[in-house]
């Protein structure tokens, strides 16, 4: 059968939302008990509508992308139907504690997020969480709502980070509403459907350690090992092995952040994933003009979470996790006394934490070597990379474009230097460095074209710059969601040229320098 231009093909039937709802099931975390979670329905969100949707995240969950058009989709993924769910099936908020800006903050918890269950697909299970679904027992002074602005930023950055190859939570959808909420100004509400294999944070362990609840602490550790670190079960000390794996993943994650110029903004221990995922997208930012001291969070007046500080803070956060796990480390070994076990546990934990620099450093060096197009490893490579970063810092050269344009530099002469050279104020400094770089490239067997292709596979052309997100947000506030979709599509192919979208890779406009992001959302 064929259709003429004047005839429309019959529309495919929309997915059955009831089937999706039926597939949701209680996840293993809530089975840990009432000490871990509180069940409650989401707060009603009036007249919800779809702002953004990720086909890719839907497929990861085994869902049809056409689900977004199914009747009731926006209602379900803002949590409205949960008011009618039986008590035993209600969503839940989890409790945790943590250090915020280096200070013990005590009990925190999911103050505006509810986990509605999990979906299984391709041998993996994914938890679905609604961020902005209303007040919980852990909301403190908050209203439990997320705003459209921050929800769009989280949705877009979740997509961007995933397609950059950086471990991250995902975002299935953003649901908006005209319901007003008060922040620094009047804004409107939104809910993000976040997806991850687990939302367990360092702060979950800190909570039960600080409250002297060893049984719950052990149950939590056993849950994480059983579900996500099964190899740790066979280790001589499973809990020490858990610390080692979480520390390694954290070190490697932050190395990936540094390699793309990503600043998280709020690296509190309650924002650190036990799985080594980027989690809790708040006042984040990708660096434009490079500044190693760059602080993306306007609320971070002391610069604790500056770009250059992220590795040190991640290491410190792992110490906090280690402290929380100390009561468990060594339980599988015979010890003459509890004091002896505890003393040995401290020694073993310090040994694990001492490996962080040797995990982070080589991971970052490998990433930077690839960004420079160096297939061979040479003793002076780290110094060459550091010299580049120093002159980038001095000239405030654009981070993303500098590395992307380096692919045009030839090992033979300076004819390809102009695009990257023009990013530097001190061009003599760049010329001196470029001569060193060319000399290093002469030791490589690859020709310029092969090297450039390899570099363009690791140096993105497109990242989520703040002004791009701001443009999409401004249009979304006028009920035009096309820019959210367009920008998300570009960010799903960050390494491709996409010449029709060159404007998204351009240097930021002057007005972008006035943008500020903070913890206000």
UniProtKB/Swiss-Prot annotation:
<feature type="binding site">
    <location>
        <position position="201"/>
    </location>
    <ligand>
        <name>ATP</name>
    </ligand>
</feature>
<keyword id="KW-0479">Metal-binding</keyword>
<dbReference type="GO" id="GO:0005524">
    <property type="term" value="F:ATP binding"/>
</dbReference>
<keyword id="KW-0548">Nucleotidyltransferase</keyword>
<feature type="binding site">
    <location>
        <position position="111"/>
    </location>
    <ligand>
        <name>ATP</name>
    </ligand>
</feature>
<feature type="binding site">
    <location>
        <position position="109"/>
    </location>
    <ligand>
        <name>ATP</name>
    </ligand>
</feature>
<dbReference type="InterPro" id="IPR003846">
    <property type="entry name" value="SelO"/>
</dbReference>
<keyword id="KW-0460">Magnesium</keyword>
<feature type="binding site">
    <location>
        <position position="271"/>
    </location>
    <ligand>
        <name>Mg(2+)</name>
    </ligand>
</feature>
<feature type="active site" description="Proton acceptor">
    <location>
        <position position="270"/>
    </location>
</feature>
<feature type="binding site">
    <location>
        <position position="143"/>
    </location>
    <ligand>
        <name>ATP</name>
    </ligand>
</feature>
<keyword id="KW-0067">ATP-binding</keyword>
<comment type="function">
    <text>Nucleotidyltransferase involved in the post-translational modification of proteins. It can catalyze the addition of adenosine monophosphate (AMP) or uridine monophosphate (UMP) to a protein, resulting in modifications known as AMPylation and UMPylation.</text>
</comment>
<feature type="binding site">
    <location>
        <position position="112"/>
    </location>
    <ligand>
        <name>ATP</name>
    </ligand>
</feature>
<feature type="binding site">
    <location>
        <position position="280"/>
    </location>
    <ligand>
        <name>Mg(2+)</name>
    </ligand>
</feature>
<feature type="binding site">
    <location>
        <position position="144"/>
    </location>
    <ligand>
        <name>ATP</name>
    </ligand>
</feature>
<feature type="binding site">
    <location>
        <position position="131"/>
    </location>
    <ligand>
        <name>ATP</name>
    </ligand>
</feature>
<dbReference type="GO" id="GO:0000287">
    <property type="term" value="F:magnesium ion binding"/>
</dbReference>
<feature type="binding site">
    <location>
        <position position="280"/>
    </location>
    <ligand>
        <name>ATP</name>
    </ligand>
</feature>
<dbReference type="Pfam" id="PF02696">
    <property type="entry name" value="SelO"/>
</dbReference>
<keyword id="KW-0547">Nucleotide-binding</keyword>
<keyword id="KW-0808">Transferase</keyword>
<protein>
    <recommendedName>
        <fullName>Protein nucleotidyltransferase YdiU</fullName>
        <ecNumber>2.7.7.-</ecNumber>
        <ecNumber>2.7.7.108</ecNumber>
    </recommendedName>
</protein>
<keyword id="KW-0464">Manganese</keyword>
<dbReference type="GO" id="GO:0070733">
    <property type="term" value="F:AMPylase activity"/>
</dbReference>
<comment type="similarity">
    <text>Belongs to the SELO family.</text>
</comment>
<feature type="binding site">
    <location>
        <position position="194"/>
    </location>
    <ligand>
        <name>ATP</name>
    </ligand>
</feature>
């Amino acid at each position: 059968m064929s259709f003429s231009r004047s005839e429309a093909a019959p529309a495919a039937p929309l997915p059955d939302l009831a089937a999706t709802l039926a597939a949701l099931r209680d996840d293993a975390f809530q089975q840990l008990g009432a000490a871990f979670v509180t069940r409650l329905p989401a707060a009603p969100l009036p007249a919800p509508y779809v702002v953004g949707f990720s086909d890719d995240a839907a497929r990861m969950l085994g869902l049809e992308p056409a689900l977004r058009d199914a009747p009731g989709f926006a209602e379900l993924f803002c949590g409205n139907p949960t008011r009618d769910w039986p008590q035993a099936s209600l969503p839940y908020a989890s409790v945790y504690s943590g250090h915020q800006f280096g200070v013990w903050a005590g009990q925190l918890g999911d103050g505006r997020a509810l986990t509605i269950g999990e979906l299984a697909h391709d041998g993996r299970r994914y938890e679905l969480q609604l961020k902005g679904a209303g007040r919980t027992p852990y909301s403190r002074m908050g209203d439990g709502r997320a705003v459209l602005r921050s929800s769009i930023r989280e949705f877009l950055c979740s997509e961007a980070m995933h397609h950059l190859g950086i471990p991250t939570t995902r975002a299935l959808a953003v649901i908006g509403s005209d319901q007003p909420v008060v922040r620094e100004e009047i804004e409107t509400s939104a809910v993000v459907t976040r997806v991850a294999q687990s939302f367990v944070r360092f702060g979950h362990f800190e909570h039960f350690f600080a409250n002297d609840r060893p049984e719950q602490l052990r149950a939590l550790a056993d849950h994480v090992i059983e579900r996500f670190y099964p190899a740790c079960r066979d280790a001589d000390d499973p809990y020490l092995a858990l610390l080692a794996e979480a520390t390694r993943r954290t070190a490697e994650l932050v190395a990936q952040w540094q390699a793309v110029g990503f600043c998280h903004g709020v690296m509190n221990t309650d924002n650190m994933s036990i799985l080594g995922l980027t989690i809790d997208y708040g006042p984040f930012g990708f660096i434009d003009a490079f500044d190693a001291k760059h602080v993306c969070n306007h609320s971070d007046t002391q610069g604790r979470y500056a770009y250059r500080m992220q590795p040190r803070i991640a290491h410190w956060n792992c110490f906090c996790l280690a402290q929380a796990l100390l009561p468990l480390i060594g339980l599988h070994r015979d010890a003459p006394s509890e004091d002896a076990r505890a003393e040995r546990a401290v020694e073993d934990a310090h040994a694990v934490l001492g490996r962080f620099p040797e995990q982070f450093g080589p991971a970052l060096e490998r990433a930077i070597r690839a960004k420079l197009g160096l297939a061979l490893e040479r003793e002076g490579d780290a110094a060459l990379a550091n010299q580049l970063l120093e002159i980038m810092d001095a000239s405030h050269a654009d981070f993303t474009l500098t590395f992307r344009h380096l692919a045009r530099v030839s090992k033979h002469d300076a004819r390809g230097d102009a695009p990257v050279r023009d990013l530097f104020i001190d061009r003599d400094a760049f010329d001196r460095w470029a001569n060193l770089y060319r000399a290093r490239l002469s030791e490589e067997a690859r020709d310029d074209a092969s090297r450039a292709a390899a570099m363009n596979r690791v140096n993105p052309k497109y990242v989520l710059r703040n002004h791009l997100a701001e443009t999409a947000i401004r249009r979304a506030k006028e009920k035009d969601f096309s820019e959210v979709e367009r920008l998300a599509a570009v960010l799903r192919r960050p390494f491709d040229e996409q010449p029709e979208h060159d404007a998204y890779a351009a240097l930021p406009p002057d007005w972008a320098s006035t943008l500020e992001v903070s913890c206000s959302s």
